[in-house]
């Protein structure tokens, strides 16, 4: 855990795929932005840091286990968090779920007073945990996560239901049990029921608001 006097405060939100992490992150961002302004708060998704696979064939890319820590470029994310804390802008990678690789373009992210970082594997990496001022684990039952994941991946990411189910059985559930669920022990706050937990969101807003005082 880092000292709260740092210029840029990093808040980590982790949990299973489709647990409601993104909803909590976007809700906190939207509501706090209305209070403090867009220049003071931002969101960075861990998904942007999936490793570049442009050197692989599409057949090889689709075999990648996206739920294993090795699929993530956490070294780059770590360097970017350090840069933001120094007051430097970063070039955020852009990842395509259709092409299964990183795109050539990037998105410039300026340092903010508060950065909300969200992703499934954030708490599995000790380097990232050390950069966080505090961390949250969204604890949603796996059956609910699966239903949400099917709806999301089919509608938003161009996947078939069969491919989503096959991936869930082969990698998503096993990797959750092996890596993601055990990382819950490192969270400072555990939020049940995901983005629908209004009381938890209000508590988190109050906690984060302290960094703007």
From Swiss-Prot:
ATP binds at residues 15-22. It is found in: Cytoplasm. One of its GO terms (cellular component) is cytoplasm. SUPFAM superfamilies: P-loop containing nucleoside triphosphate hydrolases (SSF52540). Keywords: ATP-binding, Cytoplasm, Kinase, Nucleotide-binding, Transferase. The keyword DNA-binding does not apply. Its EC number is 2.7.1.48. One of its GO terms (molecular function) is uridine kinase activity. CDD domains: UMPK (cd02023). It holds the Pfam family PRK. The keyword Protease does not apply. Pathway: Pyrimidine metabolism; CTP biosynthesis via salvage pathway; CTP from cytidine: step 1/3; Pyrimidine metabolism; UMP biosynthesis via salvage pathway; UMP from uridine: step 1/1. It catalyses: uridine + ATP = UMP + ADP + H(+); cytidine + ATP = CMP + ADP + H(+). It is an enzyme of class 2 (transferase). GO terms for biological process: CTP salvage; UMP salvage. Belongs to the uridine kinase family. This is Uridine kinase. The gene is udk.
């Amino acid at each position: 855990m880092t000292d709260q006097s740092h210029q840029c405060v990093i808040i980590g939100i982790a949990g299973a795929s489709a647990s409601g992490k993104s909803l909590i992150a976007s809700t906190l961002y939207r509501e706090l932005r209305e209070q403090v302004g867009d220049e003071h708060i931002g969101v960075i998704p861990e998904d942007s840091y999936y490793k570049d696979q442009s050197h692989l064939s599409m057949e090889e890319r689709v075999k990648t286990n996206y739920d294993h820590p090795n699929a993530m470029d956490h070294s780059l994310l770590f360097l970017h968090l350090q840069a933001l804390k120094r007051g430097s802008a970063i070039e955020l990678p852009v990842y395509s779920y259709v092409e299964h690789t990183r795109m050539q373009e990037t998105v410039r992210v300026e340092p903010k007073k508060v950065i909300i970082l969200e992703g499934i594997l954030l708490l599995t990496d000790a380097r990232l945990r050390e950069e966080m001022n505090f961390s949250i684990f969204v604890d949603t039952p796996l059956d609910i996560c699966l239903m949400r994941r099917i709806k999301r991946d089919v509608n938003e990411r161009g996947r078939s239901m069969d491919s989503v189910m096959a991936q869930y059985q082969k990698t998503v559930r096993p990797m959750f049990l092996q890596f993601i669920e055990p990382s819950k022990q490192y969270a400072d706050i555990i939020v049940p029921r995901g983005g629908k937990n209004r009381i938890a969101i209000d508590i988190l807003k109050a906690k984060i608001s302290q960094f703007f005082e």
